[in-house]
């Protein structure tokens, strides 16, 4: 499914019955969250709230919600066609493309080189193109015009500290880097032109800010936030794109057309020309504020902590812009649906590094990253433990995975009944559990003894080989194949 920008994507979703317009007035304070949550849990469409209301005042800008509320729409956002509801297969193809780009193998001969050339050529041809004028700069607010109260920013949960910008694509660049960093960081509104930028210390934006402080102490750090970006660029920011290409280049590859970029009015940062709303401004080194609490994807309110304040100097936008928003809460929520889809992208990446892996699953109930189940073709004693540590260290997306369960390839890891059977019949609690202490842990994980630092557990639920056990290992009960065929033939005559 190829598309030009967010508006074209919305139009195509609506034509397919994947987007519903809400004409009735809906309050951005809690009501919008409740409606979006009910629709998402029912597997419903994306929502365009045409008449949002904030504090009793009608807002002029509509709100787009649940854009990635199903894995099917995530696949569509990645430019894939979803036939007969099968979203897994096209996303595996995206994963195979990423694995090729991440570690391209040298051609094995002239024929192989000829077959790989179209992919490489397409990647090279998708370098973004800079334009001088752009739809996202059709309207400009500066000075006293800058007022976040004019935007329909959601207040998602009763215990939230303030309205929260959720789907903001944050654009930064470190002093020693040519390439811009794109990241999704939530932002608490604390004034008409001030938000708290909640980026964790290891995230790209925070690293760029730290390097800027070291290289240019005391100088403001330019930051831009895009609200309402094309889906491919948003998804590129949360996908393990190889360092050899930019997120903008990868987005063009998904969308089937080069990403057009325009330089911001107040800095050299570049944003997609088709963006709906753009916030331009700076972060001052000594400007910090306590952020939170907020209801998060864990299903709990998080702790309050200090983060930098982003001062907005200018807001540019399209005529009649659309504000893109979401909420996070106990799974399933939109991040959980995104996690289900990205799970399929991860599988080919892992298999490229570990061919013995047959499947990989991040259950949404585990916040889509805290627990992983892996099936593999075991080849030697200790093999499961090697796979555990390999997953923890391979992609930064798995740095916060607290639990990894490894099973043999005879177990369907998408079926908890089979996983529990394997765990209860193939695991000795002492021999088959591996504990690793003092490892990076999600800052939001209040179960860890120290914020950002905790332990991980690996569980080897594979059949044990000689050397791993001294006992005779059990053989699974399997019915004779000929008997099963015979019963299949007579089944209709049994009156059952």
Curated annotation (Swiss-Prot):
Keywords noted in UniProt: Cell membrane, Decarboxylase, Flavoprotein, FMN, Lyase, Manganese, Membrane, Metal-binding, Ubiquinone biosynthesis
Cofactor info, note text: Binds 1 prenylated FMN per subunit.
InterPro entries membership: UbiD (IPR002830), UbiD-like_C (IPR049381), UbiD-like_N (IPR049383), UbiD_bacteria (IPR023677), UbiD_Rift_dom (IPR048304)
A molecular-function term among this protein's GO annotations: 3-octaprenyl-4-hydroxybenzoate carboxy-lyase activity
Superkingdom assignment: Bacteria
EC class: lyase
GO cellular component: cytosol; plasma membrane
Known cofactor(s): prenylated FMN; Mn(2+)
Enzyme Commission no: 4.1.1.98
Subcellular location: Cell membrane
Pfam families referenced in this protein's UniProt entry, alphabetically: UbiD (PF01977), UbiD_C (PF20696), UbiD_N (PF20695)
Annotated metabolic or biological route of this protein: Cofactor biosynthesis; ubiquinone biosynthesis
Residues that, per the record, bind Mn(2+): 181, 247
GO biological process: ubiquinone biosynthetic process
Active site (record annotation): 296
Membrane topology: Peripheral membrane protein
Job description of the protein: Catalyzes the decarboxylation of 3-octaprenyl-4-hydroxy benzoate to 2-octaprenylphenol, an intermediate step in ubiquinone biosynthesis.
Family listed: Belongs to the UbiD family.
The name this protein goes by in its record: 3-octaprenyl-4-hydroxybenzoate carboxy-lyase
Organism of provenance: Azoarcus sp. (strain BH72)
The gene coding this protein: ubiD
């Amino acid at each position: 499914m190829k598309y030009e920008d967010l508006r074209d994507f919305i139009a195509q979703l609506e034509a397919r019955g994947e987007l519903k317009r809400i004409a009735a007035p809906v309050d951005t304070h809690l009501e919008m969250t409740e409606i979006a949550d009910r629709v998402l849990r029912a597997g419903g469409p994306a929502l365009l709230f045409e008449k949002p209301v904030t504090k009793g005042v009608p807002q002029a800008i509509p709100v787009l919600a649940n854009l990635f509320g199903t894995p099917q729409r995530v696949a569509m956002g990645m430019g894939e066609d979803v036939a007969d509801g099968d979203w897994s297969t096209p996303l595996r193809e995206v994963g195979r493309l990423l694995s090729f780009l991440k570690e391209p193998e040298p051609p094995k001969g002239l024929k192989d080189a000829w077959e790989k050339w179209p992919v490489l050529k397409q990647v090279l041809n998708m370098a973004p193109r800079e334009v001088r004028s752009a739809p996202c700069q059709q309207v400009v607010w500066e000075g006293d015009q800058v007022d976040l109260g004019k935007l329909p920013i959601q207040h998602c949960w009763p215990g939230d500290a303030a309205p929260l910008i959720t789907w903001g694509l944050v654009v930064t660049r470190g002093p020693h880097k040519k390439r811009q960093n794109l990241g999704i960081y939530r932002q608490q509104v604390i004034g008409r032109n001030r938000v708290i930028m909640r980026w964790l210390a290891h995230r790209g934006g925070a690293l760029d800010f730290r390097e800027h402080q070291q290289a240019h102490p005391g100088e403001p750090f330019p930051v831009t936030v895009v609200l309402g970006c094309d889906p491919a660029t948003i998804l590129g920011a949360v996908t393990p794109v190889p360092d050899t290409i930019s997120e903008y280049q990868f987005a063009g590859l998904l969308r089937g057309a080069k990403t057009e970029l325009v330089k911001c009015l107040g800095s050299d940062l570049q944003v997609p020309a088709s963006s709906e709303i753009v916030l331009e401004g700076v972060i001052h080194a000594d400007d910090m504020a306590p952020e939170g609490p907020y209801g998060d994807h864990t299903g709990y309110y998080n702790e309050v902590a200090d983060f930098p304040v982003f001062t907005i100097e200018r807001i540019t936008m399209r005529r009649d812009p659309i504000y893109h928003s979401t909420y996070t809460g106990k799974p399933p929520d939109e991040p959980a649906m995104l996690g289900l889809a990205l799970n399929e992208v991860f599988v080919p990446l892992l298999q490229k590094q570990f061919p013995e892996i047959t499947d990989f699953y991040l259950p949404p109930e585990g916040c889509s990253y805290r627990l992983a189940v892996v099936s593999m073709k075991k080849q030697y004693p200790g093999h499961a433990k090697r796979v555990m540590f390999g997953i923890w260290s391979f992609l930064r997306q798995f740095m916060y995975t607290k639990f990894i369960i490894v099973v043999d390839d005879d177990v369907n890891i998408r079926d908890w009944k089979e996983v529990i059977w394997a765990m209860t019949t193939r695991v000795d609690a002492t021999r088959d559990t591996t504990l690793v202490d003092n490892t990076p842990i999600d800052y939001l994980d209040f179960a860890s003894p120290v914020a950002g630092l905790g332990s991980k557990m690996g569980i080897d639920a594979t059949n044990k080989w000689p050397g791993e056990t001294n006992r005779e290992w059990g053989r699974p009960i399997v019915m004779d194949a000929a008997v099963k065929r015979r019963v299949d033939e007579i089944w209709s005559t049994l009156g059952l």
